[in-house]
Amino acid sequence: MENNLINEAIDKIKSLKVDIPIIAIVLGSGLGNFIHWIENPTFVNFEEIPGFQPSTAPSHGGKLIFGTFKGVNLCLMQGRLHLYEGYSANQVTFPIRVMRRLGAKNLFITTVSYTHLRAHETVL
């Protein structure tokens, strides 16, 4: 059943005639503006894709964005799901599995973190 749902999601995305992504990027909080650098973007709301769950965080877009950046085909995930929102691990990871099956060879998961370091201190 899981494979059928993944195939349905892929069929829906391919019906939109998007370029097959080489890289998938999950945009962390505060990084949503990266989409403005994408050339020829195609926006797909999670609700339009079989098996995708809605993003409940107000600042998360709940979209996949397909396009290019410096000549590389990308799939950006703007908004992500969390276990603490009540989603299962299977639901949280479903979009990642879809992006992989679409053709993404590399996955970058980003996040934003904050600190209370004094000026000129570095965290590695």
Regions from the PLM with identified roles:
Residues 2-118:
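Metabolite-binding pocket within alpha/beta catalytic cores that recognizes anionic/polar moieties
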Residues 116, 123-124:
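Single conserved hydrophobic/aromatic residue that forms the stacking wall/gate
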